Swiss-Prot record:
Localization of this protein: Endoplasmic reticulum membrane
Organism domain of life: Eukaryota
Organism: Bos taurus (Bovine)
Annotated protein name in UniProt: Peptidyl-prolyl cis-trans isomerase FKBP2
UniProt xrefs under PANTHER family: PEPTIDYL-PROLYL CIS-TRANS ISOMERASE FKBP2, PEPTIDYLPROLYL ISOMERASE
Family: Belongs to the FKBP-type PPIase family. FKBP2 subfamily.
Gene3D superfamilies: 3.10.50.40
Gene coding for it: FKBP2
Subunit description: Interacts with ARFGEF1/BIG1 and the C-terminal of EPB41L2.
Activation/inhibition comment: Inhibited by both FK506 and rapamycin.
GO cellular component terms, A-Z: endoplasmic reticulum; endoplasmic reticulum membrane
Length: 140
């Protein structure tokens, strides 16, 4: 009887531990609006071509990439897999002129492989982004 009770308690503790680590291991995308715009006639959606300025850093503040030194915006189609998943999700519903800070967990960035040599495997990425222009597919 006593052994049965001990095994039950151990089983419950083990289940709680597995559940806790399972949810803790999966971090979510964090989106912070740094600058809002007063007039927003169009918001970014899947399929739009976005013109962005960005600076990417690791959690420790080490910068790994930026469009600012070249003064050349990065242009891509949103929601089509041209960029990391954290961008495809974190840039939806943005207005021209808006600035956001994205904290992207590894699973939505470069994963366990990373992007050597600048981005190690499992890295959380921090991006400061500014949406300069939206081109709607129907306007192309």
């Amino acid at each position: 009887m006593r052994l049965s009770w001990v095994l039950t308690v151990l089983s419950i503790c083990l289940s709680a531990l597995v559940t806790a680590t399972g949810t803790e291991g999966k971090r979510k995308l964090q989106i912070g609006v740094k600058k809002r715009v007063d007039h927003c006639p169009i918001k970014s959606r899947k399929g739009d071509v976005l013109h962005m300025h960005y600076t990417g850093k690791l959690e420790d503040g080490t910068e790994f990439d930026s469009s600012l030194p070249q003064n050349q915006p990065f242009v891509f189609s949103l929601g089509t897999g041209q960029v990391i998943k954290g961008w495809d999700q974190g840039l939806l519903g943005m207005c021209e002129g808006e600035k956001r800070k994205l904290v992207i967990p590894s699973e939505l960035g470069y994963g366990e492989r990373g992007a050597p040599p600048k981005i190690p495997g499992g890295a959380t990425l921090v991006f400061e982004v500014e949406l300069l222009k939206i081109e709607r597919r129907s306007e192309l």
